[in-house]
């Protein structure tokens, strides 16, 4: 008899434990990606990325949310992918940092984005009833993504993955277990 993974099905809420830098809320997110399988079951060079719907369902984006005081930036990025997209994987070296204007709050935020090489897609996840998740090729995702700064993060990832110097084994990665996020 196998042991199944237990997933905390509640997302963190509230802003009281959020990190700020010079008055700007710090948010972290990931561009979850995987290499597409060919018809014969082999891994191809084609990359797919996972986008999610906003909670109101009107826009597509990459998972992101507040960076809290009790976690590293990589843990926050991994937690957001679990909560919003229901995926686990290896958080890789930061893609960049962007200052952007929040459409809903009218204030500037600081966004840090990471690539996540997805290793597992869960059937149940905390925000499954308020978000859709869709795997797309890079071109489709770039067109569909609402936020300019997330499109730029996607461009950085594509450039990094297409670089002949790209050596995934040497890339700094961090895997976070589900237990540390609940």
UniProtKB/Swiss-Prot annotation:
Keyword Metal-binding: yes
Cofactor: Mg(2+); Mn(2+)
Motif annotated as Nudix box, chain positions: 65-86
Ranges where the Nudix hydrolase domain occurs: 27-158
Sorted UniProt keywords: Hydrolase, Magnesium, Manganese, Metal-binding, Mitochondrion, Transit peptide
Tissue: Expressed in roots, leaves, stems and inflorescences.
Function: Probably mediates the hydrolysis of some nucleoside diphosphate derivatives.
Protein name, per record: Nudix hydrolase 17, mitochondrial
Organism whose genome encodes this protein: Arabidopsis thaliana
């Amino acid at each position: 008899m196998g042991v199944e993974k237990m997933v905390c099905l509640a997302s963190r809420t509230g802003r009281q434990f959020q990190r700020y830098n010079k008055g700007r809320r710090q948010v972290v997110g990931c561009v979850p990606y995987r290499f597409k399988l060919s018809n014969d079951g082999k891994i191809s060079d084609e990359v797919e990325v996972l986008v999610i719907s906003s909670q109101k369902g009107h826009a597509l984006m990459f998972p992101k949310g507040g960076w809290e005081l009790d976690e590293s930036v990589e843990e926050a990025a991994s937690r957001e992918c679990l909560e919003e997209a229901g995926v686990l994987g290896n958080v890789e070296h930061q893609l960049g940092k962007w200052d952007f204007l929040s459409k809903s709050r009218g204030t500037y935020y600081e966004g840090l984005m990471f690539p996540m090489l997805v290793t597992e897609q869960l059937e149940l996840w905390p925000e499954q009833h308020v978000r859709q998740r869709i795997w797309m090729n890079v071109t489709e995702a770039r067109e569909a993504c609402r936020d300019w700064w997330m499109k730029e993060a996607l461009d950085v990832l594509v450039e990094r993955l297409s670089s002949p110097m790209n050596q995934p084994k040497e890339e700094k990665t961090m895997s976070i277990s589900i237990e540390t996020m609940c």
